[in-house]
Amino acid sequence: MKNVGFIGWRGMVGSVLMQRMVEERDFDAIRPVFFSTSQLGQAAPSFGGTTGTLQDAFDLEALKALDIIVTCQGGDYTNEIYPKLRESGWQGYWIDAASSLRMKDDAIIILDPVNQDVITDGLNNGIRTFVGGNCTVSLMLMSLGGLFANDLVDWVSVATYQAASGGGARHMRELLTQMGHLYGHVADELATPSSAILDIERKVTTLTRSGELPVDNFGVPLAGSLIPWIDKQLDNGQSREEWKGQAETNKILNTSSVIPVDGLCVRVGALRCHSQAFTIKLKKDVSIPTVEELLAAHNPWAKVVPNDREITMRELTPAAVTGTLTTPVGRLRKLNMGPEFLSAFTVGDQLLWGAAEPLRRMLRQLA
């Protein structure tokens, strides 16, 4: 059995990873060692059926004794520890949820239902750094993988509807707190059937604009609104989140020529499911039934939702998908621009295939 160290296992992504590993009995195949950046010496969790104490996540000697390190601790930790470990001669496998190493030449972005061939080639060629991808990119490829695998995609334009969880646990709490403030502000009026809805709306809007809602994490109110910008601003007018779409898609697929991917990334008031609306330029006219067959056959989690109003409203929403590994795709139809133009709408859990699941499956391959 390999010695596997876990850092950042208590955070949101780490907690989902632990839950999935317990469900799949992954701990049966490894010797887990749990680390902490702040609580060393305290009792370690018993996920693996073993007892012990939390180790120091900054102790290079302890880390060097590991065969595999899995970190969900974030980019600052990776930037501090990873170079020191490699410079010390450590030759173990590093599996990371943070974005810091994604675009490095000696790292592979992991999404095995989509790029197992790239992962296998990397392992055969001595690659030892494996990084989870951007959540929207991973979820897009899980849902639309059949089109990419059959070399049918000329370019992709996307508008995202990204959940609060993409920012982190504090962002989710802030969204719910904002919702509570707004409701509490008009609760009496809502309980009075004769109250005027426009008066209620004015009270809500006034509070939203008042500066009284908690916005420490988002910077502006999200409840009852949206934020059409995610991550840093780049010189070309993109947000960094939008830049990742093309950069990471092409690295994951190891394309020989770049597939253009661009669009707008928007934060909305969903909790943990990202949704995306796509305009896809196909390389040739492909019938909708064939498109549906290719998408459904690509991986066990891609589910084609018929382009029917009632079915779509039931099955193609964050409420329906949250907490599941299913990555449904629907609203598939040809657009007025021509027979090569396809619309699609996808939904996926940002914490599962968007974050924890690719890490878990990579660890399973290595262990």
UniProtKB/Swiss-Prot annotation:
<keyword id="KW-0791">Threonine biosynthesis</keyword>
<feature type="binding site">
    <location>
        <position position="193"/>
    </location>
    <ligand>
        <name>NADP(+)</name>
    </ligand>
</feature>
<feature type="binding site">
    <location>
        <position position="73"/>
    </location>
    <ligand>
        <name>NADP(+)</name>
    </ligand>
</feature>
<dbReference type="InterPro" id="IPR012080">
    <property type="entry name" value="Asp_semialdehyde_DH"/>
</dbReference>
<feature type="binding site">
    <location>
        <begin position="165"/>
        <end position="169"/>
    </location>
    <ligand>
        <name>NADP(+)</name>
    </ligand>
</feature>
<feature type="binding site">
    <location>
        <begin position="37"/>
        <end position="38"/>
    </location>
    <ligand>
        <name>NADP(+)</name>
    </ligand>
</feature>
<dbReference type="GO" id="GO:0050661">
    <property type="term" value="F:NADP binding"/>
</dbReference>
<dbReference type="GO" id="GO:0005829">
    <property type="term" value="C:cytosol"/>
</dbReference>
<dbReference type="GO" id="GO:0009089">
    <property type="term" value="P:lysine biosynthetic process via diaminopimelate"/>
</dbReference>
<feature type="binding site">
    <location>
        <position position="162"/>
    </location>
    <ligand>
        <name>substrate</name>
    </ligand>
</feature>
<feature type="binding site">
    <location>
        <begin position="10"/>
        <end position="13"/>
    </location>
    <ligand>
        <name>NADP(+)</name>
    </ligand>
</feature>
<dbReference type="InterPro" id="IPR000319">
    <property type="entry name" value="Asp-semialdehyde_DH_CS"/>
</dbReference>
<dbReference type="GO" id="GO:0009090">
    <property type="term" value="P:homoserine biosynthetic process"/>
</dbReference>
<dbReference type="InterPro" id="IPR036291">
    <property type="entry name" value="NAD(P)-bd_dom_sf"/>
</dbReference>
<comment type="subunit">
    <text>Homodimer.</text>
</comment>
<feature type="binding site">
    <location>
        <position position="350"/>
    </location>
    <ligand>
        <name>NADP(+)</name>
    </ligand>
</feature>
<feature type="binding site">
    <location>
        <position position="267"/>
    </location>
    <ligand>
        <name>substrate</name>
    </ligand>
</feature>
<keyword id="KW-0486">Methionine biosynthesis</keyword>
<dbReference type="InterPro" id="IPR012280">
    <property type="entry name" value="Semialdhyde_DH_dimer_dom"/>
</dbReference>
<keyword id="KW-0028">Amino-acid biosynthesis</keyword>
<keyword id="KW-0521">NADP</keyword>
<feature type="binding site">
    <location>
        <position position="173"/>
    </location>
    <ligand>
        <name>NADP(+)</name>
    </ligand>
</feature>
<protein>
    <recommendedName>
        <fullName>Aspartate-semialdehyde dehydrogenase</fullName>
        <ecNumber>1.2.1.11</ecNumber>
    </recommendedName>
</protein>
<comment type="similarity">
    <text>Belongs to the aspartate-semialdehyde dehydrogenase family.</text>
</comment>
<keyword id="KW-0220">Diaminopimelate biosynthesis</keyword>
<feature type="binding site">
    <location>
        <position position="241"/>
    </location>
    <ligand>
        <name>substrate</name>
    </ligand>
</feature>
<feature type="active site" description="Proton acceptor">
    <location>
        <position position="274"/>
    </location>
</feature>
<keyword id="KW-0457">Lysine biosynthesis</keyword>
<dbReference type="GO" id="GO:0071266">
    <property type="term" value="P:'de novo' L-methionine biosynthetic process"/>
</dbReference>
<keyword id="KW-0560">Oxidoreductase</keyword>
<dbReference type="Pfam" id="PF01118">
    <property type="entry name" value="Semialdhyde_dh"/>
</dbReference>
<dbReference type="GO" id="GO:0009097">
    <property type="term" value="P:isoleucine biosynthetic process"/>
</dbReference>
<dbReference type="GO" id="GO:0019877">
    <property type="term" value="P:diaminopimelate biosynthetic process"/>
</dbReference>
<dbReference type="GO" id="GO:0009088">
    <property type="term" value="P:threonine biosynthetic process"/>
</dbReference>
<dbReference type="GO" id="GO:0051287">
    <property type="term" value="F:NAD binding"/>
</dbReference>
<dbReference type="Pfam" id="PF02774">
    <property type="entry name" value="Semialdhyde_dhC"/>
</dbReference>
<dbReference type="GO" id="GO:0004073">
    <property type="term" value="F:aspartate-semialdehyde dehydrogenase activity"/>
</dbReference>
<feature type="binding site">
    <location>
        <position position="244"/>
    </location>
    <ligand>
        <name>phosphate</name>
    </ligand>
</feature>
<dbReference type="GO" id="GO:0046983">
    <property type="term" value="F:protein dimerization activity"/>
</dbReference>
<feature type="active site" description="Acyl-thioester intermediate">
    <location>
        <position position="135"/>
    </location>
</feature>
<dbReference type="InterPro" id="IPR011534">
    <property type="entry name" value="Asp_ADH_gamma-type"/>
</dbReference>
<comment type="pathway">
    <text>Amino-acid biosynthesis; L-lysine biosynthesis via DAP pathway; (S)-tetrahydrodipicolinate from L-aspartate: step 2/4.</text>
</comment>
